[in-house]
């Protein structure tokens, strides 16, 4: 878990237990399924980069975890290198695809000739730079990663805009407790011609559409997994959950409240 992910979890459950990193999102989810961890945190969507599709795919593939919370964090991206490095030294910049996308304008202006290297996460990029000891390689990651991996901050706020935010899902092997949950996330696995009808059924149940993303279903052309998030500001009711679960192509991934940390 990188510094952004750990930050999102402390908003969800401040002071809870021990937070430890995993190399990949599937690894983190597997630990939850195996009972080795109570929760996992995965980024779901970014203001600039859109849906974090490879992480969403990992969530869809596992039927034994539930979304029990959502946290929205303001994102500040930082360029960091080994101790003693300077911006003039940098020839390669590594980060997650989202980190590279979010810093594209800054990189074009300040390091236009630097190559980029995509990593599994921004935290993995920071760790890679630290282990390399190479002054010519830098990472783009959250500011806390510099302290975590003993790196030097070379430039701050390299993201395109201060409006940059990321939504994180909190996952658990235990379904969320019943109560005043305001949001629901579901996956509809169907042909493209069917999704409009499903959206109508969701609307008729009294739920408002928040986001929808599609991913290829993988077995035939024209079939997709649609990840749909809906809300009811007054609280999602048991009846609404029953209606959604009765739609043949739909699997409910979880009901939850959403929390947002201000910059």
Predicted regions and their residues:
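Domain-level signature for soluble enzymes in the chorismate/prephenate branch of the shikimate pathway
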Residues: 1-263
């Amino acid at each position: 878990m990188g510094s952004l992910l750990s930050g999102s979890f402390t908003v969800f459950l401040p002071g809870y237990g021990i937070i430890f990193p995993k190399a990949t999102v599937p690894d983190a989810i597997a630990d939850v399924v195996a009972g080795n961890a109570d929760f996992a945190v995965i980024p779901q969507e970014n203001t600039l980069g859109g849906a974090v599709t490879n992480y969403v795919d990992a969530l869809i593939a596992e039927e034994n975890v539930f979304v029990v919370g959502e946290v929205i964090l303001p994102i500040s991206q930082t360029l960091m290198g080994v101790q003693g490095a300077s911006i003039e030294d940098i020839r390669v910049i590594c980060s997650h695809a989202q980190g590279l996308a979010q810093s594209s304008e800054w990189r074009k202006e300040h390091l236009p000739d630097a190559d980029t290297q995509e990593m599994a996460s921004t935290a993995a990029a920071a760790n890679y730079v630290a282990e390399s000891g190479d002054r010519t390689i830098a990472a783009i990651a959250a500011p806390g990663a510099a302290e975590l991996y003993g790196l030097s901050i070379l430039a701050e706020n390299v993201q395109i805009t201060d409006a940059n935010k990321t939504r994180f899902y909190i996952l658990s092997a235990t379904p969320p407790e019943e109560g005043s949950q305001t949001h629901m996330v579901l996956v509809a696995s169907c042909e493209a011609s069917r999704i409009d009808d499903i959206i109508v059924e969701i609307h008729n149940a009294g739920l408002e559409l928040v986001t929808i993303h599609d991913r290829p279903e993988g077995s035939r052309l024209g079939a997709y997994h649609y990840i749909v998030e809906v809300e009811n500001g007054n609280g999602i009711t048991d009846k609404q959950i029953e209606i959604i679960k009765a739609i043949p192509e739909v699997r409910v991934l979880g009901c939850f409240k959403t929390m947002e940390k201000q910059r």
